[in-house]
């Protein structure tokens, strides 16, 4: 009897310990699940919160950029009215200037509006803009020339930037309306065309009034100043004072040579050009350094060079300077 009691007590003790351990494991699982759920909810909340903050910052930046652009365009910026804009299609404009202008509200109202009926079109009709079929009772705008029909909202949005049919590309306006529209556009561009014609006339006058130089004279300079090789030698003529009405200052040096001394003049012009190039090279510090390096390297191999400079006493130089 005592042995039976001991076995029963040991069995009940084992059952109680198993129940306790199972309860502990269950509570631990529940606590872990709640912790994971709490972290997940906190993560979602933080993500939504920061997403809203980012959206607000982006909207503020966009508003600031729009305000800056408006201030740049006009000194007095109009009051900014924030409105919720509807999404719309953006169509690429064509090459024709008339098709890019679009239709006015008066021209849109002149186009007929019909209510779609299933009896009139057994096969069904599809709007080529929104790619959806017309249902019974839908408002459709019928184009008079090509007899194509579309939803009123779709075709009105298309006609904001176009004046042709989106399928066949035929003009919706008649020839009289299109010609009147072109005539309205011509006066706007008349002033610009006048200014461009005036500019072309001025350029042609400048090109015709440009001085002509002989072929044996070296000429260089800018648009408002013309000079030749010997700018320091010459005399001013009193007879050239009558041509001082021109606005641009011009200094011209002409080398007048005889037929017997053409070869001498060619050599003198080349020597004068060489002298000018040498003067320009002497002014730059890079050339002086190279020259000193050359002298240092060739100090043992110096060879006497004789520079022949021919001066022609028979050639006479005339300098004509025209002041404004």
Curated annotation (Swiss-Prot):
One of its GO terms (molecular function) is zinc ion binding. One of its GO terms (cellular component) is membrane. Residues 179-210, 226-248, 299-324 are annotated as: Disordered. Residues 192-210, 226-235 have a biased composition (Polar residues). Its EC number is 2.3.2.27. It is found in: Membrane. Residues 306-324 have a biased composition (Low complexity). Disulfide bonds: none annotated. It is a single-pass membrane protein. It comes from the Eukaryota. Pfam families: zf-RING_2. Keywords: Membrane, Metal-binding, Transferase, Transmembrane, Transmembrane helix, Ubl conjugation pathway, Zinc, Zinc-finger. It catalyses: S-ubiquitinyl-[E2 ubiquitin-conjugating enzyme]-L-cysteine + [acceptor protein]-L-lysine = [E2 ubiquitin-conjugating enzyme]-L-cysteine + N(6)-ubiquitinyl-[acceptor protein]-L-lysine. A zinc finger (RING-type) spans 127-169. PROSITE patterns: ZF_RING_2 (PS50089). GO terms for biological process: protein ubiquitination. InterPro entries: Znf_RING (IPR001841), Znf_RING/FYVE/PHD (IPR013083). It is an enzyme of class 2 (transferase). The chain crosses the membrane at residues 24-44. Pathway: Protein modification; protein ubiquitination. The RING-type zinc finger domain mediates binding to an E2 ubiquitin-conjugating enzyme. Belongs to the RING-type zinc finger family. ATL subfamily. This is RING-H2 finger protein ATL3. The lineage of its organism: Eukaryota, Viridiplantae, Streptophyta, Embryophyta, Tracheophyta. The gene is ATL3.
């Amino acid at each position: 009897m005592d042995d039976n009691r001991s076995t029963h007590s040991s069995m009940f003790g084992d059952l109680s310990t198993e129940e306790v351990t199972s309860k502990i494991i269950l509570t631990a699982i529940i606590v872990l699940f709640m912790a994971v759920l709490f972290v997940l909810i906190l993560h979602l909340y933080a993500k939504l919160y920061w997403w809203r903050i980012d959206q607000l910052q982006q909207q503020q930046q966009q508003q600031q950029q729009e305000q800056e652009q408006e201030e740049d365009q006009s000194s007095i910026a109009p009051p900014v009215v924030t409105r919720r804009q509807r999404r719309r299609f953006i169509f690429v404009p064509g090459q024709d200037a008339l098709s890019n202008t679009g239709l006015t509200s008066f021209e849109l109202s002149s186009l007929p509006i019909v209510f779609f009926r299933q009896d009139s079109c057994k096969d069904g009709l599809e709007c080529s803009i929104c790619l959806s079929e017309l249902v019974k009772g839908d408002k459709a705008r019928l184009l008079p020339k090509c007899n194509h029909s579309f939803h009123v909202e779709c075709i009105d949005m298309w006609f904001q930037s176009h004046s042709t049919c989106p399928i066949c590309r035929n003009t919706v306006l008649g020839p009289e309306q299109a010609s009147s529209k072109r005539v309205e556009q011509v006066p706007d561009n008349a002033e610009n065309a006048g200014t461009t014609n005036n500019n072309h006339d001025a350029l042609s006058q400048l090109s015709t009034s440009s001085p002509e130089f002989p072929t044996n004279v070296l000429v260089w300079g800018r648009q408002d100043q013309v000079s030749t090789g010997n700018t320091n030698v010459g005399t001013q003529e009193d007879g050239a004072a009558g041509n001082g009405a021109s606005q641009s200052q011009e200094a011209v040096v002409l080398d007048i040579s005889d037929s017997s001394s053409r070869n001498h003049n060619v050599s003198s012009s080349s020597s004068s050009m060489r002298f000018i190039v040498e003067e320009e090279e002497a002014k730059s510090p890079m050339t002086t350094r190279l020259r000193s390096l050359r002298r240092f390297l060739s100090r043992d191999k110096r060879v006497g060079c004789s520079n022949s400079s021919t001066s022609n006493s028979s050639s006479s130089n005339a300098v004509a300077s025209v002041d404004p």
